[in-house]
Curated annotation (Swiss-Prot):
Keywords: Cell inner membrane, Cell membrane, Ion transport, Manganese, Membrane, Transmembrane, Transmembrane helix, Transport
GO MF annotation list: manganese ion transmembrane transporter activity
Classification of source organism: Bacteria, Pseudomonadati, Pseudomonadota, Alphaproteobacteria, Hyphomicrobiales
Protein name as catalogued: Putative manganese efflux pump MntP
One Pfam family linked to the record: Mntp
Keyword Manganese: yes
């Protein structure tokens, strides 16, 4: 169980960081909307290893060779968009706006690509695959919800500077994924 918990927290850190950036961008997001986004992140992060496991049986070498590039491109693109918006205040959200589901989905996919790759190793957890997926999903849900709320508090106080930092944060997450895989 300890290994499952470590795996879940490790896979959830990208989702946490991305959710802080989303919270900064949309500081007045409702709890209900935050819970919906966290549920989406948790569900996708929990299912991603299963997808990786199933795909890995078919395309193990191909997926492993490119997953980090996809994650980097998605997260860097979202980060650059946030940086651009920080210099164009008219595009910043009003207090009532929330992220689009397309933006949430793109971020969730970008942060769950590593989890998909981890799915290739699910056999190491033996008969605990369903438990592993459940724990990953729950931990990601909780950390995403916390990240959205913390980001909202930061965003209310720092405005466009937080948007700029959030953009660099997403780029850093993507770059970390890329560098980690290229140097491994």
């Amino acid at each position: 169980m300890f290994q499952i918990a470590i795996l879940a927290f490790s896979l959830s850190t990208d989702a946490f960081a991305a959710s802080v950036a989303k919270g900064v961008r949309f500081p007045n997001m409702s709890w209900l909307r935050s819970a919906g986004i966290a549920l989406g992140f948790g569900t996708l992060e929990g299912l991603a290893p299963l997808i990786g496991y199933l795909l890995g049986k078919q395309f193990a070498g191909t997926i492993e060779g490119y997953d980090h590039w996809f994650a980097f491109i998605i997260l860097a693109g979202l980060g650059l968009r946030m940086i651009w918006r920080s210099f164009h205040p008219e595009t910043l959200s009003s207090p009532q706006m929330t992220p689009t589901w397309a933006a949430v989905l793109a971020t969730a996919v970008g942060t769950s690509i590593d989890a998909t790759a981890v799915g290739l190793t699910l056999a190491l957890f033996g008969d605990n695959i369903p438990l592993t997926l459940f724990v990953i999903g729950i931990v990601t849900f909780v950390l995403t919800l916390i990240g959205l709320r913390v980001g909202g508090l930061i965003g209310e106080r720092t405005g466009r500077w937080a948007e700029l930092a959030g953009g660099f944060g997403l780029i850093a997450i993507g770059a970390n994924i890329l560098v980690t895989h290229l140097t491994a």
